[in-house]
Amino acid sequence: MSKPFYVRFEVPPELAEKAYQALEIARKTGKIKKGTNETTKCVERGLAKLVLIAEDVDPPEIVAHLPLLCEEKKIPYVYVPSKKRLGEAAGIEVAAASACIIDPGEAKNLVEEIVKAVNELKTKAAQ
C-alpha cells in the first residue's frame, strides 16, 4: 500500500517503535496531548516537543495540515504506522490520528534521539 500524500519521509519501523515508547513514557512521567485538535493547538502555541502522526488516517485530510504546521513552527514530527497503536500508547482505548509530547519526563533522552534521527531522515529525503 502506498503512503498517504501527507507523509513526507519514510520512517523505519524501529524508529516508529521508539516514538510509541517515548509517548508511553511521557504519558506516565511527563505531559502529552492526544487527538488532532489538541495536537494542533499545542503546535500552534509552540508547546510540543515531538508530534506523532499516524499514517493510516482516513480521510487523510484530518492530519494533512500537521506536517506543514510543524515545519512552520520548527517542531519535530514523526510518522507512525498505526492510529490504533498510537491511541494505546497515548493511554486511550480508541485510535488517535495524532498525539504530541509536551513534557517528555523520563523520555527526554529518547525524544532527543528520535528528533536527531528524524532530522537525518528529512535531510536524506530532501536530497
Swiss-Prot record:
Q: Which domain of life is it from?
A: Archaea
> Where in or outside the cell is it found?
Cytoplasm
Keywords, alphabetical = Cytoplasm, Ribonucleoprotein, Ribosomal protein, RNA-binding, rRNA-binding, tRNA processing
What SUPFAM superfamilies does this protein map onto?
L30e-like (SSF55315)
Q: What is its main location?
A: cytoplasm
Query: Pfam families this protein is in?
Result: Ribosomal_L7Ae
Instruction: Give the GO biological process terms.
Output: ribosome biogenesis; translation; tRNA 5'-leader removal
Name the Gene Ontology molecular function terms of this record. ribonuclease P activity; rRNA binding; structural constituent of ribosome
| HAMAP family registered for this protein in UniProt | Ribosomal_eL8 (MF_00326)
Q: What does this protein do?
A: Multifunctional RNA-binding protein that recognizes the K-turn motif in ribosomal RNA, the RNA component of RNase P, box H/ACA, box C/D and box C'/D' sRNAs.
Family in the record: Belongs to the eukaryotic ribosomal protein eL8 family.
Q: What is this protein called?
A: Large ribosomal subunit protein eL8
Which source organism does the UniProt entry give? Hyperthermus butylicus (strain DSM 5456 / JCM 9403 / PLM1-5)
